[in-house]
């Protein structure tokens, strides 16, 4: 049976940046002990004959074949641009200073 001291609860609360009252400390002490006892029960279960499961459902990825297809022509992509330069969109600079 797991025992959690008041000091451990206060330490956990401090690490979590929580301010808890003495009553809450007692309540959290009981809650943590219950959780740890349950975890110990699970730990004692005999799983030696159980095959490891990575997912509860038998799922497989369904992927399509990756095929390259032609995109739209550059002239069509740039057709409605306000400004272009050397076959590219030209936009106002948003970075100023030495790194620009």
UniProtKB/Swiss-Prot annotation:
Its EC number is 6.3.5.-. It comes from the Bacteria. Gene3D superfamilies: Glu-tRNAGln amidotransferase C subunit, N-terminal domain. Allows the formation of correctly charged Asn-tRNA(Asn) or Gln-tRNA(Gln) through the transamidation of misacylated Asp-tRNA(Asn) or Glu-tRNA(Gln) in organisms which lack either or both of asparaginyl-tRNA or glutaminyl-tRNA synthetases. The reaction takes place in the presence of glutamine and ATP through an activated phospho-Asp-tRNA(Asn) or phospho-Glu-tRNA(Gln). GO terms for biological process: glutaminyl-tRNAGln biosynthesis via transamidation; regulation of translational fidelity; translation. It catalyses: L-glutamyl-tRNA(Gln) + L-glutamine + ATP + H2O = L-glutaminyl-tRNA(Gln) + L-glutamate + ADP + phosphate + H(+); L-aspartyl-tRNA(Asn) + L-glutamine + ATP + H2O = L-asparaginyl-tRNA(Asn) + L-glutamate + ADP + phosphate + 2 H(+). It is an enzyme of class 6 (ligase). This is Aspartyl/glutamyl-tRNA(Asn/Gln) amidotransferase subunit C. Keywords: ATP-binding, Ligase, Nucleotide-binding, Protein biosynthesis. Heterotrimer of A, B and C subunits. Belongs to the GatC family. The gene is gatC. One of its GO terms (molecular function) is glutaminyl-tRNA synthase (glutamine-hydrolyzing) activity. It holds the Pfam family GatC. The keyword Protein biosynthesis applies.
């Amino acid at each position: 049976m797991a025992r959690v001291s008041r000091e451990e609860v206060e330490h956990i609360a401090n690490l979590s940046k929580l301010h808890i009252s003495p009553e809450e400390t007692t309540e959290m002490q009981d809650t943590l002990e219950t959780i740890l006892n349950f975890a110990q029960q699970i730990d004692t279960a005999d799983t030696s004959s159980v095959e490891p499961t990575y997912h509860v459902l038998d799922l497989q990825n369904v992927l399509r074949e990756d095929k390259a297809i032609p995109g739209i022509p550059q002239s069509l992509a740039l057709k409605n641009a306000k400004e272009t330069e050397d076959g590219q969109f030209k936009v106002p600079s948003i970075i100023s200073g030495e790194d620009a």
